[in-house]
Amino acid sequence: MSVREHGIGDYEWRFARQFHQTAPARGIRLRALQTLLWTKALLSTRGFHTAMNSLRALKATRADSIHLPPESSEHKRICASAAAAIAEVALWVPYRVECLEYSMSLSRLLLSHGICPTFRIGVQRYDFLSHAWVEVGGQVLGDDPNLPERMCPIVEI
């Protein structure tokens, strides 16, 4: 029996404090809020396919501007701060932020700071579940660190 067959159980994705130990840096909250609202508007008005293509295009255009080495302390600080900022501002908006909006917004915010994330959507068969998350350097940001082993990725940007 593989680890993926164990799955992640009855998963209710929320902003668990255990995954957001870092306080957001000053100034990042407003950018996080703008990014979250823009992502929600794009998904609501243009749909999933357009939002995914938009993220692909943004990542392709920003690939040349990635400048922080993944092992630097500044890189790690920005990653943790961005994940915490999106989680915090998600509590301010008048709608429930799901994993898709959170992960797309986090990916966009990281790209704007010169960090290249990997956006993933994965599934498990039983109980059927799909979930979106973000990784940087093989580490899950703002979510269960065991997701890559417990879910089968079907989309990666």
Description of each model-found segment:
Residues M1-E71, I78, A87-Y95, S112-H113, ...:
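N-terminal accessory/pre-domain segments preceding catalytic cores
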Residues S81, A85, M104-I157:
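Hydrophobic/aromatic-rich core segments of domains that either
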Residues E98-Y102:
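Acidic, low-complexity glycine/serine/threonine-rich segments
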